[in-house]
Structures are given as C-alpha cells and as structure tokens.
Amino acid sequence: MKLGKVVGTVVLSQCIEAYHGQALHLVMELDENLETVGTAQVCATWEARSEEEIVIFEVAREAANVADPAIPSDASIIGKVEKVHIDW
C-alpha cells in the first residue's frame, strides 16, 4: 500500500464493461513529508474523490482484487485518509 494525493480525474468516453461504474483518478505518491513524488498513476476506485484528497492506494496485481468482482487494474484507491500523524 502507498500513501498518495489525488491530483486529477480521468473521464472515459468509451470503456470495457469492467470499468462501468468505476471512477478513475490520477494519484501521485507522497513521501514522508507529504510531498508528491514520481509521476501520476491512473487509479480505479468505487467512489469519486476530490482533488487534493489523501488516499491509500495499491499497485500491481493486488490492485485488481480491490473490486468484487476483480477488475483489470494495476492501481486502485482502497481508502480515504482522514488524518496523518508523523511522530519524529
């Protein structure tokens, strides 16, 4: 699992059946200072998210198993983060 920030939304005009009803967002991974790093990834999710929301997302094969039934995805949002506390 990774901590990330929603930075955009993806709108499909046509899609495969498995993606009907799915929301797609662009998510960037966050580092230990909650700064974005790397490049944005398209993540599937069951519920629309707002830009700037912090989320937990899964990548690789595990991402496909988030939905029931599984969807063909290599990145999925699995939860919304309400608060982050870092104790240095």
Regions found by a protein language model. Name each.
Residues H25-E29, V42-C43, I56:
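Short, acidic/hydrophobic/Gly-rich beta-strand patch recurrent on exposed beta strands
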Residues I56-W88:
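C-terminal structural segments of small proteins and small subunits
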Residues E51-E53:
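Loop/turn positions that initiate beta-strands
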